[in-house]
Amino acid sequence: MAYMCADSGNLMAIAQQVIKQKQQQEQQQQQSHHPQQQFLGLNPFSLNPWPSTTMSANPNLGYGLSGPAAFSDPFQSGPDTGDPPGFSFSNMEHQHSGGFRFPDFTGAGGEFDSDEWMDSLMNGGDSTDSSNLPSGCDAWQNNADFGIYPSDPFNTSPSRLTVGCSPPSDLNRVISDSLWADPSPQEIKPKTSPPQQPPPTAKNEVVVGSKEVVELSSSPVLKAFVECAQLVESKVDQAVKSLIKLKESVSENGDPGERVGFYFVQGLCRRVAVGELDDLKNFHQTTSEEFTLSYKALNDACPYSKFAHLTANQAILEATEKASKIHIVDFGIVQGIQWAALLQALATRSAGKPVRIRISGIPAPVLGKNPAASLLATGNRLLDFAKLLDLNFEFEPILTPIQELNESCFRVEPDEVLAVNFMLQLYNLLGETPGAVETALKMAKSLNPRIVTLGEYEVSLNRVGYLTRFKNALRYYTAVFESLDPNMSRDSQERLQVERLLLGRRISGVLGPDGIRRERMENKEQWRVLMESSGFESVSLSHYAMSQAKILLWNYNYSTLYSLDDSQPAFLTLAWNEVPLLTVSSWR
């Protein structure tokens, strides 16, 4: 079966578009009236890790836009208006001659054979050692970059996923028998009624200081969850009884509140059991293909990664507008999909193509203990794509452990304009002390970058008490689950897999036992403190960057409950129903 290519983060899809547009120009020059050629099964890369899946019910989702001529030809530069380079939108008042564009991949674009792609993904040349992951997840962790995610946006860090197991106690047998008996596929009866609009944010949810202390007493079920979380810390037997009752009021096939509650019950059980339930089938009976398709489905349904990469790339593009040599240090690269759109923008900028573009890639933790093969495959894909754009491009894998990195590892040349990218990766270094994050930031500062881009999840789950962490996580993930409903129906198997394999695992990491394996995140105020204490000052995002982020939400027909909020000193936040989800900023 062939899947329609609908993802502008997909290098193969962009390559098809690039070649098709070049051919259109040649046909126009020759005044040819032959029908536009379509490229079927084109794959200029030796390994294509970016899948496309069947389109969701909304035809405008993913990276495709409706209409064959939605945007101008990215290879046709107009006069220099003096405006910042950026995405060129045909429906904006001012055109920008060089920058990012939304190509149309929903029209008569290329198709490719999904079986052939799956073989190359699962049996390709970038396998890594992820022995500290559950065995069923090994292949997935080696190929976890989708759409324009730098890595799994809801990935549980490999170093934090598993907990050593001791022989099961009587308490854990009770919990396992009472709470973890998942219904078989035959027992699941999805609701047939259409999904309802997510309820508005409760009136009495408040934010106190920088730690987002949230009151969730408006809903009896949410209140019961908070009370159960209190019991988990002191009265375990009562907590177990409470969890048994809560299990009756939640469902992985219900409304967003019921579904998020289902995974919070599981997370609380893991905490009560002190890691002894890690072998439950919900956490290990998965295949790499299931993970792969889940990431693709999430990226098609929600704008998380599109927003983060679009905004960061725009800041880099503006900071390097007239640079002839550009060097990007990418902390936490997986498969480099973020850079496809940037390379295309640099190839068409009004100031002309750069003389050289170089990316130094520091592997993300998700690549495991031996990331060399994955980085090599990433570099080869980007090199092949740069050749299509006629760009002089270099990729340098950085295999030095992050704690040992110094300025000499990057060979920064005096005539290079340097950009440093931290995209949904620094949170992996968070701990009870900020030492690891500060070390990475100060090392980046020593490189004297022109611009530093930072993208992080907007929720405080680090140095706060367990109850506050629980409340913050409940509010955050309730919003995430609600955001899936407009484009994923209640009976959608894609939605079930996204929540079970991606979000449920992350919730478990947040609520589970404390220690180095626990998932940690911080809000923008804490990131501001960390950035400023490391010597960085904020750089305001341009009006154009903010405008194009708004147009991104509009053009892809996402729910009107998505919103953008710009706040001091220079943050741009994507929110769902007024609950912040992701924040992007730039620094120098």
Curated annotation (Swiss-Prot):
Cellular component per GO, a single term: nucleus
Motif range for LXXLL motif? 426-430
Main location as per UniProt: nucleus
Going by the UniProt record, its keywords in alphabetical order are:
DNA-binding, Nucleus, Stress response, Transcription, Transcription regulation
Q: Which InterPro entries match?
A: TF_GRAS
Q: Which Pfam families match?
A: GRAS
**Cellular compartment(s):** Nucleus
Q: Where is this region: Leucine repeat II (LRII)?
A: 377-408
The ranges of region (Disordered) come to: 23-46, 75-95, 181-204
Where in the sequence does UniProt note compositional bias of the Pro residues kind?
Answer: 192-201
Query: Disulfide pairs?
Result: none
- Per the record, which residues fall in region PFYRE? 418-509
Task: Report motif location: VHIID.
Answer: 326-330
Recorded family membership: Belongs to the GRAS family.
Question: Protein name, please?
Answer: SCARECROW-LIKE protein 7
Gene that produces this protein: SCL7
